[in-house]
Amino acid sequence: NPEEAVCGGIITILVDGDPLANMQAYREMEQGIRAGQPGVLVTRVVPWNDTQVLIKRCWATGHCDLQLPGNEMQRIKQEVNSILLSGNRSDYRQLDIAIPGEQEMVKVFLEPVFPPQHLIIAGAGHVGRAVSHQGKLLGFEVTVIDDRVEYANSINLPDADNIVVRDIGQAIQELPKDRDTYIVIVTRGHSHDADALRPCIGSQAAYVGMMGSRIKVAKMHEEFIAKGWATEEQWNSICTPVGIEIGSVTVEEIAVSIAAQLIKYRGNRGPSVKK
């Protein structure tokens, strides 16, 4: 009843009564996600009667035959390419297609499916552990790096998908850093922070944040500029001190402020409000 809806709106729910009929699409989607490849799930909905519809799904980068006119399939492919090029995870689209000889329009839904974005945390101490937990809640694939096995282990880091025990700077140097990569540096000291930060300078990472006092950050800024490790523009792209200003005091509060900043950057809503 629309009058009883809290939001005051109306929602239509599509229930797939025979999901096994589209298992090939689901398998191809799973394979794509495991391989780290984005794709689009295409769903064709054909009215059957007043309350039922016929559903056919395909994974757009796999075998996709929706039994539609050729020009309409070409239109769908163009829409799929547009979604993938945009990289927008919320770019859901609906197409209404007229079929010759049919009165009802065929609806086609396009749902982008992207692999999880990657959160790399340099440092497995108290803050790294808390940020790992927050990152997992936000849907990131979480990798934590530390050279201390007593910290870099599954007992201390139960939320981490990947735990790397080795030199922090070398590990970050070798890991891919693209626009779906978010890097948080929370190591145990100045030299380790510098080692972790240097490979991030000039990378394509969507976000690089480093924890530290304003005094420490100022000293590192001076060092990086003086040694030619970063330009002023590159340094200014780093979120340091890390996190959004919410008066954080405890480790957990600091992790929440960092998580909030990650959300802000992931949503492409402009630079952090951290001053």
Where in the sequence are the language-model features?
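ADP-ribose/adenylate-binding Rossmann-like module
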Residues: 145, 182, 187-190, 198-223
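Short, structured coil segments at secondary-structure junctions
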Residues: 158-160, 203-204
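Short, well-ordered alpha-helical microsegments
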Residues: 128-129, 193-194, 217
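Segments forming oxygen-rich coordination pockets for charged ligands
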Residues: 1-147, 151, 155, 161-164, ...
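Short amphipathic alpha-helix with an adjacent loop that forms part of the alpha/beta core around
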Residues: 169-179
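Conserved SAM/SAH-binding loop
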Residues: 166-171, 191
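Adenosine-phosphate binding glycine-rich loop
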Residues: 210-275
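Short amphipathic alpha-helical segments
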Residues: 132-134, 156-157, 176-177, 195-199, ...
